[in-house]
């Protein structure tokens, strides 16, 4: 064997040694962490130890990503736990204890995949970071879930649609009041569900701007929890009933502070946009009152599904949206 071949063979052996040392070190560190021995007599423990470590790694990686990602928008989100039957051995990612049983051993978050005991789920903090692989669609998806999954301030549908409307539609007569073709609006919805932020809603595909406004309104209507949440609905209605304008404005501002951060940011962005719409009233014939009529029932829904309540509250819904538009620079 020539000297060059001997040198290459020696380097290969050295590389194998260097590779094995960190592996051995990792075994020792894991063993210390879990309180077991991995010497000559304890080597047989390495396989179950590795299995246990792997069962914990997804949780560790997820929490590390949350800690170190500076661009992450700090919106709190509760976990969406559902009873789950696990195949094979699983450990609780909260208490690190084994999940006993053959069926329904614990619960799994359907948004991020966190696995915990049912009793432990009551103590898990609101730190759900949804996994994009688990988000099947954009429409009908919880707003906070969507923005956390995509790590954005607002839902992509809102950003993309408003950007398109402001680029070519602010002077369109009856903007938001005139409806586009329903089947074309459904096409836009399917495009967002299928392609996400890559959805093409340009004038080349949808020349009628009313299709884009219709798709935006449909997104808000399809939210499982409205922009103005069920928890704050009655408080907004009560604020709208206050006769004194200054006191009413103050009351509305106080209730706004109760909205979840993602809802607040989306509502703020929408109101800034609608204010721009009213600034083109001479062309589009849409003032704050007209937009309030359109967006009141779209952004606000009573907690109880009552037609009578909805009809009774319509004027207050309109007034709330009108106030938000006219005073967006003060309220937000």
From Swiss-Prot:
Localisation per UniProt entry: Membrane
One GO biological process term: signal transduction
TM helices/strands, residue ranges: none
SUPFAM superfamilies, per the entry: Cysteine-rich domain, GTPase activation domain, GAP
Regulation: In the inactive state, the N terminus protrudes into the active site of the Rho-GAP domain, sterically blocking Rac binding. Phospholipid binding to the Phorbol-ester/DAG-type zinc-finger/C1 domain triggers the cooperative dissociation of these interactions, allowing the N-terminus to move out of the active site and thereby activating the enzyme.
Domain Rho-GAP: 141-332
GO cellular component, one term: synapse
Superkingdom classification of source: Eukaryota
Keywords: GTPase activation, Membrane, Metal-binding, Zinc, Zinc-finger
Membrane topology summary: Peripheral membrane protein
Coiled coil region boundaries: none
Single annotated GO MF: zinc ion binding
Site, Arginine finger: residue positions: 177
Zinc finger (Phorbol-ester/DAG-type): 78-128
Function in brief: GTPase-activating protein for p21-rac.
Protein's name in the database: Beta-chimaerin
Organism phylogeny: Eukaryota, Metazoa, Chordata, Craniata, Vertebrata
């Amino acid at each position: 064997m020539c000297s060059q071949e001997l040198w290459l063979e020696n380097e290969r052996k050295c590389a194998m040694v260097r590779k094995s040392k960190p592996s051995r070190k990792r075994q020792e560190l894991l063993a210390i962490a879990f309180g077991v021995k991995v010497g000559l007599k304890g080597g047989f423990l390495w396989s179950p130890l590795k299995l246990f470590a792997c069962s914990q790694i997804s949780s560790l990686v997820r929490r590390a990503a949350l800690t170190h990602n500076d661009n992450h928008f700090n919106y709190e989100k509760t976990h969406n736990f559902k009873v789950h039957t696990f195949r094979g051995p699983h450990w609780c990612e909260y208490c690190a204890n084994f999940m006993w049983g053959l069926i329904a051993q614990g619960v799994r978050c359907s948004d991020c995949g966190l696995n915990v005991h049912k009793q432990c789920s009551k103590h898990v903090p609101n730190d759900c970071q949804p996994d994009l692989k688990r988000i099947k669609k954009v429409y009908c998806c919880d707003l906070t879930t969507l923005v956390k999954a995509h790590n954005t301030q607002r839902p992509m549908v809102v950003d993309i649609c408003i950007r398109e409307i402001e680029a070519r539609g602010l002077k369109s007569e009856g903007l938001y009041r005139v409806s586009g073709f329903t089947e074309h609006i459904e096409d836009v919805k399917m495009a967002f569900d299928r392609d996400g932020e890559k959805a093409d809603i340009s004038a080349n595909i949808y020349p009628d701007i009313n299709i884009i406004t219709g798709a935006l309104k449909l997104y808000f209507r399809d939210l499982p929890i409205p922009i103005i949440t069920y928890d704050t609905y009655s408080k907004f209605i009560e604020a709208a009933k206050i006769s004194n304008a200054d006191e009413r404005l103050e009351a509305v501002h106080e209730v706004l502070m109760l909205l979840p951060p993602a809802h607040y940011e989306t509502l703020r962005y929408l109101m800034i946009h609608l204010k721009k719409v009213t600034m083109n009233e001479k062309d589009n014939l849409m003032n704050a009152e007209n937009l309030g009529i359109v967006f009141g029932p779209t952004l606000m829904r009573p907690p109880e599904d009552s037609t009578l309540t909805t009809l009774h509250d319509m004027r207050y819904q309109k007034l709330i949206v009108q106030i938000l538009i006219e005073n967006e620079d003060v309220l937000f």
